[in-house]
Amino acid sequence: MATRYDSSITEPKWRERWERDGIYRFEPDSDKPKHYAVTMLPYPSGNLHIGHWYAMSPSDVHARYMRMRGYNVFFPMGFDAFGLPAENAAIKNNLDPRKWTYSNIEYMRGQLQSMGMMVDWDQQIVSADPEYYRWNQWFFIQFFKRGLAYKKFSAVDWCPKCNTTLAREQVVGDERRCERCDSLVTKRDLDQWYFKITSYADELLNFSELDWPERITTMQRNWIGRSEGAEISFKSEAGDPITVFSTRPDTLWGATFMVLAPEHPLVAKLTSAEQKASVDAYVAEAIRKTEVERQSTDDEKPKTGVWIGAYAINPASQERVPIWIADYVLMTYGTGAIMAVPGHDERDFAFAKTFGLAIKRVVTQSEQTAETPLEAAEPAYGTVVNSGQIDGLSSAEAKEAVINWLEAEQLGKRAINYRLRDWLVSRQRYWGTPIPMIYCPTCGTVPVPEDQLPLLLPDSVDFKPTGESPLKLHPTWRFTTCPTCGGEAERDTDTMDTFVDSSWYQVRYLSPHETNAPFTKAIADKWLPVDQYTGGREHAVMHLLYTRFWWKAMRDMGLVSANEPMTRLINQGVILGEDSNKMSKSRGNVIDPDMLVAQYGADTVRTFLMFIGPWEQGGPWNNRGIEGCVRFLDRAWRVVTDTPQRHDAVGDASTLERQTHRIIKKVGDDLQRFAFNTAIAGLMEFVNELMKVRETDVYGTTTWRKATETLTLLLAPIAPHIAEELWEFLGNSQSVHLQAWPSYDETLLIDESIELPVQINGKVRGKIQVAATADEPSIIATALADEKIAPLVAGKTIVKQIVVPNRLVNIVIK
């Protein structure tokens, strides 16, 4: 056999054989326990970068490992094919986005196959296929019928020069400019579709069935932002009610001014003539900013705002409070108005200091009085002061008392507020799922009949920016007849947010050729939820949250029985350039996986990506590291295939047997917890030991063969091609990937003997070898008889003898 492993020959050979023999074919009806593993599907942007490899190859390793453990594993792959990059490429290069996308899919699929992934490509889904997005449209209609889809006016980013809406990704820089023409981006109100994710807000806060990283559940919890408090009604001096939501109604007497969101509908009505110019200018500037910018807590960022020239009345103190507008108050949170309590809220305090507004203490801590000056905001609970009838109550008691008083006086009510907003799904783009709704002047909004789905995305559409949705400008597509009355009607010309495509694809994988339903329910009932999901943590509050919402909606429709889409989630880290910076073409630090595969082979690239460091942390690329993995696989190859010139040294078969059983346990435990780097480190040490043992008389024995077979089996999930070649070399005809994971004997994991340091008065004076099962008296006896220890204790009084099991012996003398 060749003395060196040639990946350019071996890897294509085995991939062809896997395909021919169908060893990865999905078998939904198998009696084996199921394991459904999914990695987030890629966008077909042109080619796989090293980040795709870093996300996908370890996921493939874990799936292979679970298969060898006896599970019926399903590990599918597909493409998130709709979206902005295809449309941008089409505009820039005068291309058909469909041809661009499907050409990329064909190329990327070849790359994924070269990775050696355990994928049944008959189960592939492509979200731009009409047979896929047909069911996006079907779900939309079901949501509409159930009240989960509705339409309302809302603001979108708008480029006045390009005359079009912009997606979030097209707004760049701190000044929020259009990426196409560099114009300042503004806002525009459009009538758009929403999914009512807020209907599931409380249920989405329940993570009890999820084995997910704490940072992800924390991000979702904060994003949903459930707050308990009260809605309180202030009135302007002109009599207009202004409702605020507060989590601290106990501080109502400390509200010394009010702040409205610049977009609040009362701003225009209440603004005085003297303040109108200043208010209008501030509103125009504020609405250009993102919510993130407006809610920044950066201490160095100056607080901005404008008094509108009007006052409201505090319903508790009856004091006049000035009404301001400021960009840190959002119409999308609460009521779009706040009562400002600068004494006990840091942002209100900074605002009051900036503009010279009154600050009043209404809560004290121990050793403070009602007159103690406020040097900074004090948000902590305490004892209420300067608050009329609730003086002396604790903050918690006062909170309840104020809510009861508000309800009795019809000035407010107990309320729960959420930061979460409903999901805006309308997009004024071309390359997406057409929204299946029809507008009839007689019948109103009517869904496309389900037997007419899919509503196909038309070809020959001019998607150059004009200020309208591209489908609206198609000469015929938008004109139709009402399915209810038969009269003239028009289609909705927006397309869906592409997060719709990725909210349920995990279910479609199970039956991608089903034509009568989005998926085959019997298969879904058996295989759901997903057992293992992998992908980036950047999807915490969009894709992952939207998927959970979609799942609960499907459950309530009777389509699935599971409460959650995936049980276990693992997030991989980010692979960096050699300079430890994020890879980018501008930095010149991008790693091309195709070149690496051509030079080293897919197995080497897979191995290094898992050896580079803890998978959940990521780390910088290191060319020296990949050379080390080349040497490791070469040594593994040689230890199995080469015959040593001499192997007559005396060896210890029992030691090799123990090492073999230990490495089985270690690699299995490590792969189960996605600790790929330590699994590979263990295999490297095992190969080094085998290189030594093969020069002894243990070489060629049953123990040796068991060790080399074990090495091959343990390598199989990590380096699937070379493992096949080694397995065949060892005389096996069936694929290594159809073999069982090797078992280990618990008794062989324990050392026959162990080495213990011996301390005298806390200082190490020697070491002893004892049986691993030795009891304390025999360990003490061995220590006292040791040739180094015995002279040191001779003639001394032994005060104490301490044995720390498996760690040390300490003898105290005087």
UniProtKB/Swiss-Prot annotation:
An annotated GO cellular component: cytosol
Subcellular location: Cytoplasm
Motif 'HIGH' region per UniProt: ranges: 42-52
Entry EC no(s): 6.1.1.4
Reaction equation(s) it catalyzes: tRNA(Leu) + L-leucine + ATP = L-leucyl-tRNA(Leu) + AMP + diphosphate
GO biological process, one term: leucyl-tRNA aminoacylation
A Pfam family matched in the record: tRNA-synt_1_2
Classification via SUPFAM superfamilies: Anticodon-binding domain of a subclass of class I aminoacyl-tRNA synthetases, Nucleotidylyl transferase, ValRS/IleRS/LeuRS editing domain
InterPro entries xref list: aa-tRNA-synth_Ia (IPR002300), Leu-tRNA-ligase (IPR002302), Leu_tRNA-synth_edit (IPR025709), M/V/L/I-tRNA-synth_anticd-bd (IPR013155), Rossmann-like_a/b/a_fold (IPR014729), tRNAsynth_Ia_anticodon-bd (IPR009080), Val/Leu/Ile-tRNA-synth_edit (IPR009008)
Binding site for ATP: K585
Signal sequence annotation: none
Family designation: Belongs to the class-I aminoacyl-tRNA synthetase family.
Official protein name in the record: Leucine--tRNA ligase
Organism this protein belongs to: Herpetosiphon aurantiacus (strain ATCC 23779 / DSM 785 / 114-95)
Lineage of source species: Bacteria, Bacillati, Chloroflexota, Chloroflexia, Herpetosiphonales
